[in-house]
Amino acid sequence: MRLSRYFLPILKENPKEAEIVSHRLMLRSGMIRQQSAGIYSWLPIGLKVLNKVCTIIREEQNRAGANEILMPTIQSADLWRESGRYDAYGKEMLRIQDRQKREMLFGPTNEEMVTDIFRSYVRSYKDLPLNLYHIQWKFRDEVRPRFGVMRSREFLMKDAYSFDLDYEGAKMAYYRMFVSYLRTFARVGLQAIPMRADTGPIGGDLSHEFIILAETGESQVYCDRAYLDLAVPGADTDFRNDAQLTDTVTRWTTPYAATDEMHDEADWAKVKPESQVSARGIEVGHIFHFGTKYSEPMGAKVQGPDGKEHLVSMGSYGIGPSRLVAAAIEASHDDAGIIWPKTIAPFGAGIVNMKPGDEGCDGVSEKLYEALTNAGVDPLLDDKDERPGAKFATIDLIGLPTQVIVGPRGVAAGEVEVKDRKTGERQSLGIEAAINMLTAQA
């Protein structure tokens, strides 16, 4: 993509309404635009990042055996009355009527609808286990939306729902999603720590929030430093191997980790002082086993191997891709702007033509652009006629992992300067050497 043809509305000043780093940088770098309180448009560069996050989520959900569907945003109030949640949910739910005066709602979540889909088609235990997921926009009428897309009223969610014959099956479905989430966050460039969460009236211990440590986090969290050294399950993880999954979950839940709500001072005291980490954290995912909470009132049953009907045991697993984008910025930025992990960067590299109109600079820039494009690097070429300071500020702000600086002096010497955005390291390379280095990383 050529910057001269790209819609990138950069803001020179920090927006006054932005309270946290991610909100400020997303507005300044032209990723989003606020349309009303807690509601945002995603602009080209922001949408590219969001789509890359969703691609990783899909790949890991599919790897774990989940099936993607797409449920509508508008739901019937009747389904929610079946579960008993319509009147109990509160003012966060946007309730509407169609022209026939039928009561509808803008879905804040999808347990009722996915349970209705399941009960309409699945009759036998032989069709289990089953996991259905979708990625869809949700709306919750927050009293005080703030922090940009971190706590907005409209947001993108990946919701997965598992259906199993009994608790043991549901536990393994939970473990599969647990491991899938560890891999997802690692691929997005985040180190997420699973922390035991409240299970409410259902009880048990199958509820975890995945938290990343960040100074601007909403929650106070406590964890053993051992988490920072745990190896994330690799791409060779066998999601059909129950013993392997159980071992992984055990390793990732044995050290102490808790949010402020679940913190236990007595257990915390057992952690060696030098291993205690007390910090702020951002929730990036939540997984939860809720048994027959929805299958019982909605009649989601299957015939078991004993010939009798059994209520299915369910779980839900949520990740907010839009929130995850903001969390990645909170975890990786500096005073100059965003520092994207390579896996979700909007472009693989930025080529900065320091003197558009100069035959030498134009020729080298075009050669680099063509070579990187053909190699699948997806470069952004800054071919705009602006002063060097503005070009450097823009390329740093949008956070591309690698910058290639093409200037008259370097071109005369047959070289370009390659800068690593994260480390700030610069090296002068011959043009072919630079192409080889960057294409090897594609």
UniProtKB/Swiss-Prot annotation:
<dbReference type="InterPro" id="IPR033730">
    <property type="entry name" value="ProRS_core_prok"/>
</dbReference>
<comment type="similarity">
    <text>Belongs to the class-II aminoacyl-tRNA synthetase family. ProS type 2 subfamily.</text>
</comment>
<keyword id="KW-0963">Cytoplasm</keyword>
<keyword id="KW-0067">ATP-binding</keyword>
<dbReference type="InterPro" id="IPR002316">
    <property type="entry name" value="Pro-tRNA-ligase_IIa"/>
</dbReference>
<keyword id="KW-0547">Nucleotide-binding</keyword>
<comment type="function">
    <text>Catalyzes the attachment of proline to tRNA(Pro) in a two-step reaction: proline is first activated by ATP to form Pro-AMP and then transferred to the acceptor end of tRNA(Pro).</text>
</comment>
<dbReference type="InterPro" id="IPR050062">
    <property type="entry name" value="Pro-tRNA_synthetase"/>
</dbReference>
<dbReference type="InterPro" id="IPR006195">
    <property type="entry name" value="aa-tRNA-synth_II"/>
</dbReference>
<dbReference type="GO" id="GO:0005524">
    <property type="term" value="F:ATP binding"/>
</dbReference>
<keyword id="KW-0436">Ligase</keyword>
<protein>
    <recommendedName>
        <fullName>Proline--tRNA ligase</fullName>
        <ecNumber>6.1.1.15</ecNumber>
    </recommendedName>
</protein>
<dbReference type="GO" id="GO:0004827">
    <property type="term" value="F:proline-tRNA ligase activity"/>
</dbReference>
<dbReference type="Pfam" id="PF03129">
    <property type="entry name" value="HGTP_anticodon"/>
</dbReference>
<dbReference type="Pfam" id="PF00587">
    <property type="entry name" value="tRNA-synt_2b"/>
</dbReference>
<keyword id="KW-0030">Aminoacyl-tRNA synthetase</keyword>
<dbReference type="InterPro" id="IPR004500">
    <property type="entry name" value="Pro-tRNA-synth_IIa_bac-type"/>
</dbReference>
<dbReference type="InterPro" id="IPR036621">
    <property type="entry name" value="Anticodon-bd_dom_sf"/>
</dbReference>
<dbReference type="InterPro" id="IPR045864">
    <property type="entry name" value="aa-tRNA-synth_II/BPL/LPL"/>
</dbReference>
<dbReference type="InterPro" id="IPR004154">
    <property type="entry name" value="Anticodon-bd"/>
</dbReference>
<dbReference type="InterPro" id="IPR044140">
    <property type="entry name" value="ProRS_anticodon_short"/>
</dbReference>
<dbReference type="InterPro" id="IPR023716">
    <property type="entry name" value="Prolyl-tRNA_ligase_IIa_type2"/>
</dbReference>
<dbReference type="GO" id="GO:0006433">
    <property type="term" value="P:prolyl-tRNA aminoacylation"/>
</dbReference>
<comment type="subunit">
    <text>Homodimer.</text>
</comment>
<dbReference type="InterPro" id="IPR002314">
    <property type="entry name" value="aa-tRNA-synt_IIb"/>
</dbReference>
<dbReference type="GO" id="GO:0005829">
    <property type="term" value="C:cytosol"/>
</dbReference>
<keyword id="KW-0648">Protein biosynthesis</keyword>
